[in-house]
From Swiss-Prot:
Keywords: Cell inner membrane, Cell membrane, Lipid biosynthesis, Lipid metabolism, Membrane, Phospholipid biosynthesis, Phospholipid metabolism, Repeat, Transferase, Transmembrane, Transmembrane helix. The lineage of its organism: Bacteria, Pseudomonadati, Pseudomonadota, Gammaproteobacteria, Enterobacterales. It comes from the Bacteria. Signal peptide: none annotated. It catalyses: 2 a 1,2-diacyl-sn-glycero-3-phospho-(1'-sn-glycerol) = a cardiolipin + glycerol. This is Cardiolipin synthase A.
Length: 486
């Protein structure tokens, strides 16, 4: 009996070390950033079983077998659609401003199409204005309405949008709604999904959370896009979820969420439509390629102004493109660079690009919320402040609520707005969308919004920052070490 017990013990020990060695080898063989690999190895060696389970669950990008197969199957038809779109030469810009040209060339080379011209844009900063405009557009819709959101929280004006969407479906408009399973958990536990389906709306719960499949698909891979397309002509995107901020996270202690949305009219809606069709096919297996833009789709003067490139990320989309776009924007800056984000845990490359811009004389400002709804990200963000301040970057801490806007403005001409936070999750993991806009007029509008944010912010004093307590510095460095995993 003793011999059997000893043998079992040795086999258990051997299996334990083989498991650690196998996971270690898997981490080392994956092409990933060194800080990320080191952080995972530290967790595994300090807390082996917890670390191994965590790595197998969220350490690698698993879309899931079925969705991965759909992603591979959709690309031949999507590539053909994009190639056919090139025949619509009237919608593509032939040149860009000097500051935007490198980024637009990058997007064209990697996505296969040039920037789309002939669009009319409107920046919207008040949730009531966004929802009222959306309700009007829904009421005037003639053919189709397609939406995707990370969060849909019932209550307030969000319910009015839901009612108008159901009314549209009842009068024959083809309505599709895709919502992230984790972000919209309150919605899917409410009566609204059944009400909408009964009205004729196709409602899809994207990336369902299922703990039984935790090792088969990465559970923290989320559908983070916020997009609306109406009649393949009107489109919305930005940082705002389908929530009324007066009813959303009121007990979080961070104030109301402050967002920015762009409402667009023009052929850019078609470019956004192909992104939506890819998401829909990955999730449902159904192909819904949008029609090409009509030759008469551009009523705006000379079909000029507001040239836009859509940049999408996520499994199945061009890898690392949003990260490359942000790097290109930072290195293209000559006069000033203003970045707004609720979560600031950048990659080493992006962090150095920001510091380098400031060190070569560019006026660099970063606007962050003073209070954050994520304690981990909040502490990790502060670990970057000392080097940013030393490089000459201005850090503004917004005090008027949780600033949720994601925006970048370069030299007043190149603007980036969308759903992408400056953190690892947005840069490398989630389904995201960003608009790159080459237009001085839009840049002026965005600058006015950012100036308003700055007027409601406090500039971080470098001298006071260096005098913060030792325990805060220790906490910052601790969370910074794990920042590659956040």
């Amino acid at each position: 009996m003793t011999t059997v017990y000893t043998l079992v013990s040795w086999l258990a020990i051997l299996g334990y070390w083989l498991l650690i060695a196998g996971v270690t080898l898997r981490i080392l063989m994956k092409r990933r950033a060194v800080p990320s690999a080191m952080a995972w190895l530290l967790i595994i060696y300090i807390l082996p079983l917890v670390g191994i389970i965590a790595y197998l669950a969220v350490g690698e990008l698993h879309l899931g077998k079925r969705r991965a197969e759909r992603a591979r199957a959709m690309w031949p038809s999507t590539a053909k659609w994009l190639n056919d779109l090139k025949a619509c030469k009237h919608i593509f810009a032939e040149e860009n401003s000097s500051v935007a040209a490198p980024l637009f060339k990058l997007c064209e080379r990697r996505q296969g199409i040039a920037g789309v011209k002939g669009n009319q844009l409107q920046l919207m900063t008040e949730s009531d204005d966004v929802m009222q405009a959306l309700i009007r557009d829904i009421q005037l819709a003639r053919h189709n309405i397609e939406m995707v959101f990370y969060i849909w929280k019932p209550g307030g004006m969000a319910d009015q949008v839901a009612e108008s969407l159901m009314a549209a479906a009842r009068r024959g408009i083809h309505c599709r709604l895709m919502l992230d399973s984790a972000g919209s958990v309150a919605f899917f536990r409410s009566p609204w999904p059944e009400l909408m389906r009964n009205a004729g709306i196709e409602v899809v719960e994207a990336l369902k959370v299922n703990l039984m499949r935790v090792f088969l698909r990465r559970m923290d891979l989320r559908q983070h896009r916020k997009m609306i397309m109406i009649d393949n002509y009107i489109a919305y995107t930005g940082s705002m979820n389908m929530v009324d901020p007066r009813y959303f996270k009121q007990d979080a202690g961070v104030g109301q969420w402050i967002d920015l949305m762009a409402r667009m009219e023009g052929p850019i809606a078609t470019a956004m439509g192909i992104i939506y069709s890819c998401d829909w096919e990955i999730e449902t297996g159904k192909r819904i390629l949008p029609p090409p833009p009509d030759v008469n789709i551009m009523p705006f003067e000379q079909a000029s102004g507001h040239t836009i490139h859509t940049i999408a990320s996520g499994p199945g989309f061009p890898e690392d493109l949003i990260h490359q776009a942000l790097l290109t924007a930072a290195y293209s800056a000559r006069e000033y660079l203003i970045m707004t984000t609720p979560y600031f845990v950048p990659s080493d490359d992006l962090f150095h690009a920001i510091c380098t811009a400031a060190q070569r004389g560019v006026d660099v400002s970063i606007i962050l919320p003073r209070k954050n709804d994520s304690m981990l990200v909040g502490w990790a963000s502060r670990a970057f402040f000392t080097e940013l301040l030393a490089a000459g970057v201005k850090i503004y801490q917004f005090e008027g609520g949780l600033l949720h806007t994601k925006s970048v403005l370069v030299d007043g001409e190149l603007s980036l707005v969308g759903t992408v936070n400056l953190d690892m999750r947005s840069l490398w993991l989630n389904f995201e969308i960003t608009l790159a806009i080459d237009d001085k007029g839009f840049g002026a509008d965005l600058a006015a919004v950012q100036d308003d944010y700055i007027s409601r912010s406090r500039l971080l004093d470098a001298r006071l920052w260096l005098k913060r307590p030792l325990w805060q510095r220790v906490a910052e460095r601790l969370f910074y070490f794990f920042s590659p995993l956040l």
